[in-house]
Structures are given as C-alpha cells and as structure tokens.
Amino acid sequence: LELQLIVTGAHLEPRFGITVQQIEADGFAIDERVPLGLESDAPGDLARAMARCLEGTSEALGRLRPDLMLALGDRYEILAAAQAAMLHRVPLAHIAGGDITEGAFDESIRHALTKLAHLHLTTTAEAAARVARMGEEPWRIHVVGSPGLDQLRRLELLDRTALEDALGASLGSRNLLVTWHPVTLEADRGLAGFEALLAGLDALPREVAKWITRPNADPGGAAVEAALDAWAGGREDVRVFASLGQLRYLSLMAQVDAVVGNSSSGLYEAPSLGVPTVDVGDRQKGRLAAASVIHCPAEPTAIVAAIGRALEMDCAGVENPYGDGDSARRIVEVL
C-alpha cells in the first residue's frame, strides 16, 4: 500500500497549534494541504469552511487519483471530504462508524459517513452491530478497535521529570487533565455546562493542579475559550494549552489523577492508562464506556462529588472496550 496524505482543518490553523508540524515531525510526507480559513465558529463560517474542504479535497483527489480514501471519525470536514470522494468515485473506508454521541451533531455526521462508506472499520462489536442495522452488508464491516490506543503501545511516554520539562511547569500533588468541547446540540452549545464545570473546579483545593486544553473548532468554541480565559487568568493552579500534541498529552494523561470534561479521550485512551474519567454532561451520552468512567450531570455539586470519587478509584487493570492497541495492523489487513 502507498500512503497519500491530505491534511486539512484545525491541523493547519495557528490558533489550534499548527499540529501539521507534529505530523511532519513524525516523518510523514504531506501530499496535499487543504486550508479551510476557519475565521470563526459561526455556522455560516463553518459552512464556508466545509465548502472549501469539498472543493480543495476534490482538487487533491483529481491530482492524486487514489484507489481508496481512509477517513476517521465524525468531523464536519471529513463529511465534506467524503462527499468529494463520492463524486470522484473513490471508495471510502471509514473508521469509528456506529459509535454514539447523543449530545453532538457529530452523531448525524458519523451516520452520514457510514452511508457514504464502502468499508466500515468499527471500534467495537456493538458499533459493528449498529452499522449492520443501518443496512450495511456484513462483509463490509470489520471490528478493529480504536487506532488511538495503538499509540499507547508504540510511544515511549515521558516520565514525570521529562514531562515537566516539556510542559515548562511542575505537576502538583494532585492533577486533573481537563477538556471541554462545545455540545453542539444544546441551545447554548454547552456554555452553561462549561461554566458549571469551572464552578466545580473552583470548589477544589488549590493544590489540585488543573491542566486544561482548549476546545475544538465546533460552533460555540469561541464562547468556551472566552469563559476559560476569563476564569483562568492569574491562577497559579491552572495551565492552559492550545494543543499539547500527542506525546505530551498522553504522557500527561498517564500522570494525572483523573481526566475531567467531555472529550472522547477520557473514554478511549484513559482506561488503558488506568486513569479514571469524570465525563460531564451529554456530549458523550450513549458512548460505550469502561468501568473507570464516571458519568455526571453538568452541575457543580455533582462534578465535585464525581471528582472526589475519581480521586479514590483504583483503575489498574480496567478493561478497555475499545480494543488492545493493535488496530493499525487489522486496518491494513482489511484494506
């Protein structure tokens, strides 16, 4: 198999850390870049970004002429890229179809991608069954697990000292890794839920260090960022990062006492590291979760109580329903 790589979306945006540089640092040659000009998270700007992605991916496919497109997940950019593949009669292999996230429009995008795809590389048997119920032929459906877990086997994570050097700050006696993304199906895009999370974090002792990553480019992200900056300014117990990159992020996850917020990484990667997760609100509602995941409503008192429970949990040996970290081999075999 010959890899041709198209990079688009937040990977090319300065405010999200220009993470295309990390792709290149890992030794991958980038064949095409499709900048989207993400001016804001307003629906009109995102619609224009999708149009640019459709046009740019179409042009890239015309030049590259691949035999197949491989795409992961449920981002709106991927939906546009998949439409371009359809028009160019390029078969689509889709990773992570059949998963559930009831609180986000990602749910609709993911299922739309399933109907555009020709091969379905699902994370769990439950997801595979859901894809089959959508009418997809059994021979097209393959359970491969979550590719994100492969990196936990392949990366040499930083130890505490090296991580502190890489972060430019010392870990606390207790540490939380916090991420909040917009909840796109809620009227306020999840802003009230984020404010409840901040109130819950406020109630914790100051010796609990909060390591916070900024939200994604979904509608409502700018409002979440503004609330975060207003709350975090001048606080010695808070560190905020646009992007930690894969190595620092997973290394930090392995060192913290709990993962808190509504990111899928708390359900996908954290269980494999033996780290408890406090999943706040409805963004991940319906998604299969390990025993190390505590679901709680977006209410300050409930969040504080859930964090308290998490800090007392022993999650060593928890079974991760998303696989064993050997997804890449299975995917390549299917392709």
Q: What is the meaning of each model-derived region?
A:
Residues 36-138:
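Active-site and donor-binding regions of nucleotide-sugar-utilizing enzymes
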Residues 71-72, 79-82, 94, 120, ...:
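A donor-sugar binding/catalytic signature common to diverse glycosyltransferases
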Residues 4-49, 56:
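Conserved nucleotide-sugar phosphate-binding/catalytic loop shared by glycosyltransferases and other
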Residues 271-317:
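Nucleotide-sugar donor-binding patch of glycosyltransferase catalytic domains
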Residues 305, 309-335:
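C-terminal amphipathic helix plus adjacent low-complexity
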Residues 192-207:
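Short hydrophobic signal-anchor/transmembrane segments that target glycosyltransferases
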